[in-house]
Amino acid sequence: MIAALYEKHLLPHLIDFACGMKAITRQRSTVVPRAHGRVLEIGIGTGLNLAHYDAEKVDTLCGLDPSLALHAIARDRLAATRLKLELVPLSAERIPADDSSYDSIVCTFTLCTIPDPLTALSEMRRVLKPGGELLLSEHGLAPEPSVQKWQHRLTPV
């Protein structure tokens, strides 16, 4: 019961805080605006990328994340944008889309959390249109001690 309360009420806010740090936000702001056309975001989480999309370049956005608790926060963030968003409660190992469906796929600081990253990457390749872009940003251990502290706290997640 305590684990369920933690997962539903505390963990989403910890993830949001840790993933919203300045260094990570700067990286998001260089990667996400490149997305265009029909966009799939892998691990949309709490919607921290939503503010970085160029609404003039994005026709539709599908956000994939297995956590419904994170979807609720993403929906709140969506209100501050002009994006059309569909949230799908699935992991990236089974993307519910036809082959060659997306112009851009955005995956920021998520691949390290996917149980089977090779299958997820294979699925991303399958649904990405020929000539489409996979906009990927991952991290190793950050040089900033304050970021490292949060990375270590979230490692079990």
Where are these regions (language model features)?
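Conserved alpha-helix/loop element of class I SAM-dependent methyltransferases that forms part
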Residues: 18-38, 48-52
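Conserved SAM-binding loop
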Residues: 63, 87, 103-106, 136
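A short SAM/SAH-binding and catalytic strip from SAM-dependent methyltransferases
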Residues: 104-116
